[in-house]
């Protein structure tokens, strides 16, 4: 009578309940998580995909998934299920770690660019006080060039001209200090 379910009152203790393993719902949730992980891997660029540790069978499945038309075809959904099924028998921790590194790199780059934009705005609005602070942090910058760009950007704003110096200042800062931020 091991395959027949008993009413709850007939169980001796909680250990008998644990013998059945994870519920069907939990198995479906786990499969869905792996399927979403597979979809993330398929959506990566080729250079990012090379950084993910995949065995040959899984790499072939991902490559085929990249060739299918996403979200327009039932075959793509079934293929994602197949990729999820392949990942069930593999250790997915290294794959998840590599994916998180790729995602964090994007957010780190965005944060750097945002800090550059903040410096540019401060230089234009605060003038010399922001310039002195920037120069104290980054000695290799050309103070004279920055002052000239600040004056030109302010003049462009006053005359409602296209922001040529504004953009040029950003490009200069990006070229000189982006890696240092």
Curated annotation (Swiss-Prot):
Q: Does the keyword Cytoplasm apply?
A: yes
Q: Which domain of life is it from?
A: Bacteria
Which terms does the UniProt entry file under GO BP? assembly of large subunit precursor of preribosome
Main localisation: cytoplasm
Pfam families, A to Z:
DarP
Give the UniProt entry's GO cellular component terms. Answer: cytosol
Q: SUPFAM superfamilies annotated for this entry?
A: PSPTO4464-like
Task: Please give the Gene Ontology molecular function terms for this protein.
Answer: ribosome binding; rRNA binding
Region annotation (Disordered) ranges: 1-23
Q: Does the keyword Cytoplasm apply?
A: yes
Q: Where in the cell is it found?
A: Cytoplasm
Keywords for the protein's UniProt record, in alphabetical order: Cytoplasm, Ribosome biogenesis, RNA-binding, rRNA-binding
What is the role of this chain?
Member of a network of 50S ribosomal subunit biogenesis factors which assembles along the 30S-50S interface, preventing incorrect 23S rRNA structures from forming. Promotes peptidyl transferase center (PTC) maturation.
Q: Which PANTHER family match?
A: UPF0307 PROTEIN YJGA
Q: Which NCBIfam families match?
A: PRK05255.1-1
HAMAP family linked to this entry: DarP
Recorded family membership = Belongs to the DarP family.
Q: What is this protein called?
A: Dual-action ribosomal maturation protein DarP
Organism this protein belongs to: Aeromonas salmonicida (strain A449)
Q: Which gene encodes it?
A: darP
